[in-house]
Amino acid sequence: MKVILLQDVKKIGKKGEVIEASDGYARNFLFPRKLAQEATDSNMHILNNKKENERKKKLAEIEAAQKLAGELKGKEITIKTKIGESGKLFGAITSKDIASLIKTQYNVEIDKKKIVMDTIKLAGNYDIEVKLYPEVSTKMKVNILPQ
């Protein structure tokens, strides 16, 4: 019997997959626990529509991320802060600081977790990476100057 999995089932398959299961296993285990439903024509049509909608949504998200990456590519962020005699900062510049500066300077809100960088503790010029989507990222420059 062909069934559509409604949830991930260990050693069987993932949500949305169409698998072949024995009649007894499907009727006595999968169906009562709402883990699967029978793969009828109407259920298959609904599943295909859901997959198509998810694919379109993902493509739209990737397109938006690529557009944003194009806008941010090569942009510079200049930070003026107090610096000690040896060039060390009083405090440090973190991804949270960079995210708030991107928001103020370019009016683009980016989650701090999407900014890939080490904590900046010295004055100078740095390259950071902003991962907007798993396959989409861009590089930006950060300049740390004395106040």
Swiss-Prot record:
PROSITE patterns xrefs: RIBOSOMAL_L9 (PS00651)
Indicate yes or no for the key word Ribonucleoprotein.
yes
One Pfam entry for this protein is Ribosomal_L9_N
* GO BP annotation list: translation
InterPro entries assigned: Ribosomal_bL9 (IPR000244), Ribosomal_bL9/RNase_H1_N (IPR009027), Ribosomal_bL9_bac/chp (IPR020594), Ribosomal_bL9_C (IPR020069), Ribosomal_bL9_C_sf (IPR036791), Ribosomal_bL9_N (IPR020070), Ribosomal_bL9_N_sf (IPR036935)
Q: Does the keyword Ribosomal protein apply?
A: yes
The highest taxon in the source lineage is Bacteria
One GO location term (cellular component): ribosome
The record's annotation in PANTHER family points to: 50S RIBOSOMAL PROTEIN L9
Q: Which NCBIfam families match?
A: L9
Function statement = Binds to the 23S rRNA.
| Protein name per its UniProtKB record | Large ribosomal subunit protein bL9
Record the organism: Clostridium botulinum (strain Eklund 17B / Type B)
Q: Which gene encodes it?
A: rplI
